[in-house]
Structure formats: C-alpha cells, structure tokens
Amino acid sequence: MDGIKYAVFTEKSLRLLGKNQYTFNVESGFTKTEIKHWVELFFGVKVVAVNSHRLPGKGRRIGPILGHTMHYRRMIITLQPGYSIPLLDREKN
C-alpha cells in the first residue's frame, strides 16, 4: 500500500484500539477519502469515520546547515462494530 506508511503504537493509539479505532501515519498528500478507500480495500473492513491531523516536521542540523524532515499526516480510522484489523489485534491484549 503506497499511502499508509505504518501503524502507530503510542499510549493514545493503544487506548483507542479498545474503541475499535486504528491509528496510521500516511503520506501527507493523501485525503481522507483516499485512505478510507485503501483501508476498506486492503483490510476488507467497513470504515465509519476518518479523523486526521498533520504533524510538523522536525528540525535537523548538520554542522552549519539547518534543515527539517518532511511533515506527515496521522489518520485515526474508526471501524464498524464487528470489524477489526487482524494484524493489529495482538497489540490490544
């Protein structure tokens, strides 16, 4: 899958797993509808809602040169009751 980079496992995202919500970092150019389509197609689940926020890039310094990393988007995907993403269910326990 090109759009989704990886699943996020923070305290908040692990707490949201109990509410059937999964958190992913995605490429910043993708929209909510594109990610919803990809998740439904790839995992075979029904998505109820998609929330997103853009996280800023971090500053990096190499000697006198100041740069930054790319910003990225984090999506919180809510599934219909009865559906789950099997690869991420192990983190729930």
UniProtKB/Swiss-Prot annotation:
Any one Pfam family here would be Ribosomal_L23
Keywords from UniProt, A to Z, are: Chloroplast, Plastid, Ribonucleoprotein, Ribosomal protein, RNA-binding, rRNA-binding
Note the InterPro entries from the entry.
Nucleotide-bd_a/b_plait_sf (IPR012677), Ribosomal_uL23-like (IPR013025), Ribosomal_uL23/eL15/eS24_sf (IPR012678), Ribosomal_uL23_CS (IPR001014)
User: For this chain's UniProt record, which GO biological process terms are given?
Assistant: translation
Single GO cellular component term: ribonucleoprotein complex
* PROSITE patterns named among the record's database cross-references: RIBOSOMAL_L23
Highest taxon, organism lineage: Eukaryota
Q: Does the keyword ATP-binding apply?
A: no
Please name the GO terms that the record assigns under molecular function. Answer: rRNA binding; structural constituent of ribosome
**Which cellular compartments is it found in?**
Plastid, Chloroplast
Record note on quaternary structure: Part of the 50S ribosomal subunit.
- Write out the similarity annotation: Belongs to the universal ribosomal protein uL23 family.
HAMAP family reported in the protein's UniProt record:
Ribosomal_uL23_B (MF_01369_B)
Task: Tell me, in a sentence or two, what this protein's role is.
Answer: Binds to 23S rRNA.
Question: Which protein is depicted?
Answer: Large ribosomal subunit protein uL23cy
Tell me the gene name: rpl23-B
